[in-house]
Design a protein with these regions (language model features):
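Short secondary-structure capping micro-motifs at structural edges
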Residues: 14, 48-53
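N-terminal beta-loop-helix "entrance" segment that forms/cooperates
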Residues: 29-48
Length: 121
């Protein structure tokens, strides 16, 4: 199981500690890798990094993506996250057969759209 996070979040030791305590590896994603497919970033077999460097803007907020994690481990993570009083992250996702082909930027745009919809904006 792994947790992909934007490089800005990698300074948040509290998230790293929760992940490490549960055996979840943390992959810090640099902005230059935002052109890569999430499957490649997560190291999924059959996906490879392409020779493209992302030159766009960074994400406007933090995003956390889980890969290879079952619902029990995800529930444990979220419980520990809350118990440790870590500031909430609005944009969270689990890799699926659909979004595994997306880039971080594409997933962020979709999560942002869903967040606005559920927030009634």
């Amino acid at each position: 199981a792994s947790c992909l996070v934007g490089s800005e979040m990698c300074i948040r030791d509290s998230i790293k500690k929760v992940c490490e305590s549960l055996g979840i590896s943390v992959i810090c994603v640099d902005r230059c890798d935002y052109a890569q497919k999430l499957g490649a970033i997560a190291g999924i077999v059959g996906f490879g990094m392409v020779n493209i460097i992302y030159l766009g803007r960074g994400l406007s907020d933090e995003m956390m993506v889980f890969s290879g994690i079952d619902s029990e481990l995800l529930d444990k993570f979220l419980s520990e996250y809350k118990k440790n009083g870590i500031e909430p992250i609005n944009y969270k996702a689990v890799l699926t057969v659909n979004n595994i082909f997306w880039t971080p930027e594409e997933l962020f745009a979709e999560l942002k759209k869903e967040h606005r919809k559920f927030a009634g904006r």
